[in-house]
Amino acid sequence: MTDAQIALRALSDPADLEPLQPLYEHSDGPSCGFLQGLLDQSHCRAWCLVKDNQPVAAIWYQCVAERAAMVDLRVLASERRQGLGRQLLWASLTALGDVGAVELEVRSSNMAARALYKSLGFSETGLRPKYYATPDGREDAILMTLTLNHGGSAT
């Protein structure tokens, strides 16, 4: 058996979204229409992780001045628990270059994502009470921040 070929690919054109459709089916995150609009803006930075020529994960940021807000990080359901989210997040943090800090929000119940972010140096910096809708009501959003040096690594 051969090892899978994994590569980081920048997203820069609306045509780049078509292969990402399986990542966004049945999701409560941003729609492909929203992401296409975001990709059209100069402050968007986005990448996907490609495994054996198929996109298996994607990450999106809005960058203003020296700050980046992570809009979405998503891994194909069948590819989760293999370290691909960590690999994509780390590669994107390096590729952000001159960004001084990355901010994100995550559902309070998403313990796997929170653990991933903490393991890479993000710290919890705030709370948005009852921010997300759930089948049973509302759920808090945890705000997290990572300060980077200008080489893209955590400080």
Predicted regions mapped to residue ranges:
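Acetyl-CoA-dependent GNAT
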Residues: 2-80, 86-91, 95, 130, ...
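Conserved GNAT acetyl-CoA-binding A-motif
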Residues: 96-108
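Short secondary-structure boundary/hinge segments and terminal tails
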Residues: 97, 112, 134-135
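Conserved catalytic-core motifs of GNAT/GCN5-like acyltransferases
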Residues: 103-105, 118, 123-140
